[in-house]
Amino acid sequence: MMSTPETATEATAPEAAPAPSLGADAPAPLPSLIGLDRDKLGAALDAIGVRGSDRRMRVNQLWHWIYLRGATDFAEMTNVSKHLRADLAAAYSLARPEIVMEQVSQDGTRKWLLRFPADHPGERPHDIETVYIPESDRGTLCVSSQVGCTLNCSFCHTGTQRLVRNLTAAEIVAQVMVARDRLGDYPGRDRATGPGLPTEGDRLVTNIVFMGMGEPLYAYDSVKEAIETLSDGDGLGLGKRRITVSTSGVVPEIERLGAEVGPMLAISLHAVRDKLRDELVPINKKYPIAELMEACRTYPAASNAKRITFEYVMLKGVNDSPADARALVKLLEGVPAKINLIPFNPWPGTQYECSDWETIERFSDIVFRAGYASPVRTPRGRDILAACGQLKSESEKLSARERLALRAMMAQDE
């Protein structure tokens, strides 16, 4: 990853130090309770002999300490009996995923490279990236739902990494736990300081967006369970209006998401004609634009108060003409919508360039005059490859040639 003193800092958290190699006779790590929902916490208690009417109370206690207080040790749970704390510590842990790398951008954006254990002995562990984007009035955490991605969107860096597997609900929730740990975003913790952090309100992580690595609707069951845990008012307490699921257009799951879960919806659109979208977002060949837009018009959770966000990356000479803007306006008729125009963020090896600002502003003005909010998303975290479309979980740093190429691309956009 590119890092220069004036643009970014790179830090490895104390708990992120590489674990020593385990010998053949070394005990396996204890299973962690982090990220589990109430049913799974109940099952964990049942396994150590906590049953009957007592179990529900104990689940509520664990929920409070894990998700509201951010406990990292069972010893912190002072209203839980010493005997039960000992039993819990003997069978389980409160371990978070390993932080392999933490980077802080010059604009305050933070990116964590997180490592989950291998699924089977002898296999490689799984690395994913999570990004925190602070603003004065909010802090948005961009979480991943898959290790890699299968969509192969031509403008997206994640699409160059093969899909390994879906993340579990616990692994999705654990990303939020890590971010709140590192930011001190729990009662009684020392809050993080630095450029760009929210100055309003009492929370640093206020919003969650499923816009990291992977297609969330291909990991539907995990995403649904994770949202229920994240939105529980007795714990992390992130209301569903503060949780956005972004999809490239898995049409059959869009209605299901609205009916069963009801978060905010974002669509990675990026083109208004099937021929171009087939190239940019290949899933369009399976679910073309007409089918996608019909799913949006009937999305159960959509309303004027809960508009669907359409994401549109601005690619120089590809999809940024005034005719494209007018076609976008026509396409959105009948949909409660807003449009996020995203300046393309460069990454090594890409064939695309970002539209110039005059072109972006002209495009935005056409959409705005038609009655749609059309903010231009300010690029955040470009210097640490944390911006939209730049995530990729490989832990190896960029080669010198790739760093020079990236610097050149960024310089051209300034």
UniProtKB/Swiss-Prot annotation:
Q: Which SUPFAM superfamilies match?
A: Radical SAM enzymes
S-S bonds: 142-388
Gene3D superfamilies from the xrefs? 1.10.150.530, Aldolase class I
Q: Name one Pfam family in it.
A: Radical_SAM
Q: Which residues bind [4Fe-4S] cluster?
A: 149, 153, 156
> Where are the catalytic residues?
129 (proton acceptor), 388 (s-methylcysteine intermediate)
Disulfide bond recorded as keyword: yes
Reaction catalysed? adenosine(2503) in 23S rRNA + 2 reduced [2Fe-2S]-[ferredoxin] + 2 S-adenosyl-L-methionine = 2-methyladenosine(2503) in 23S rRNA + 5'-deoxyadenosine + L-methionine + 2 oxidized [2Fe-2S]-[ferredoxin] + S-adenosyl-L-homocysteine; adenosine(37) in tRNA + 2 reduced [2Fe-2S]-[ferredoxin] + 2 S-adenosyl-L-methionine = 2-methyladenosine(37) in tRNA + 5'-deoxyadenosine + L-methionine + 2 oxidized [2Fe-2S]-[ferredoxin] + S-adenosyl-L-homocysteine
Entry superkingdom: Bacteria
Instruction: Name the segments for region: Disordered.
Output: 1-24
The first-level EC class reads transferase
Chief location bin: cytoplasm
Q: Which GO BP annotation is one of this protein's?
A: rRNA base methylation
List the biased-composition ranges (Low complexity): 1-20
* Subcellular location, record wording: Cytoplasm
User: Which controlled-vocabulary keywords does the entry list?
Assistant: 4Fe-4S, Cytoplasm, Disulfide bond, Iron, Iron-sulfur, Metal-binding, Methyltransferase, rRNA processing, S-adenosyl-L-methionine, Transferase, tRNA processing
Task: Tell me its cofactors.
Answer: [4Fe-4S] cluster
| Matching PANTHER family | 23S RRNA METHYLTRANSFERASE, RADICAL SAM CORE DOMAIN-CONTAINING PROTEIN
Instruction: Give the UniProt family note.
Output: Belongs to the radical SAM superfamily. RlmN family.
* Other facts: Reaction proceeds by a ping-pong mechanism involving intermediate methylation of a conserved cysteine residue.
Q: Which NCBIfam families does the annotation name? A: rRNA_mod_RlmN (TIGR00048)
- In Swiss-Prot or TrEMBL terms, this protein is called Dual-specificity RNA methyltransferase RlmN
Source organism per UniProt? Xanthobacter autotrophicus (strain ATCC BAA-1158 / Py2)
